[in-house]
Amino acid sequence: MDVRQFLSDCEAPEEMVALRAAADAVGVDNRACAHLYTMLWEGVNLEEVHASLLGDGVVNWGRVAAFMHICRYIVRTFPSSMDRTEVALTKFIQDPKIDKQLREWTDRLGTVGLIGRCLEWLGAGVITGVVLSLLFY
């Protein structure tokens, strides 16, 4: 996955709505998403968000999408944060739990099924770019 390319491709205006929906759908700890609608995202500690999203050991599409959308939102809103956000997203994708799950989903569902699963979480059209980016890393 080209993390920098993914972070630079921030055209979906629905991202924050999708992020909130994903967080609600999967019961993400509210502390991880406490500042969704504030301008405090520039300094958010992405490592803490990563830990909070996966703290209970559960990996699902909503949590993967939520973290990726947080990263894209931060870069779109604060372009100077690209380098630190790229590092955080790379660590997230390389997290053994995430990597294992992504490979299992791809093996089990195939490309079309994998995209369909993501769309179930966030609504048609919002997460397609995320899924395609994951498939080809």
Swiss-Prot record:
SUPFAM superfamilies in alphabetical order: Bcl-2 inhibitors of programmed cell death (SSF56854)
A GO biological-process term: regulation of apoptotic process
InterPro entries: Bcl-2-like_sf, Bcl2-like
Protein name: Uncharacterized protein 097R
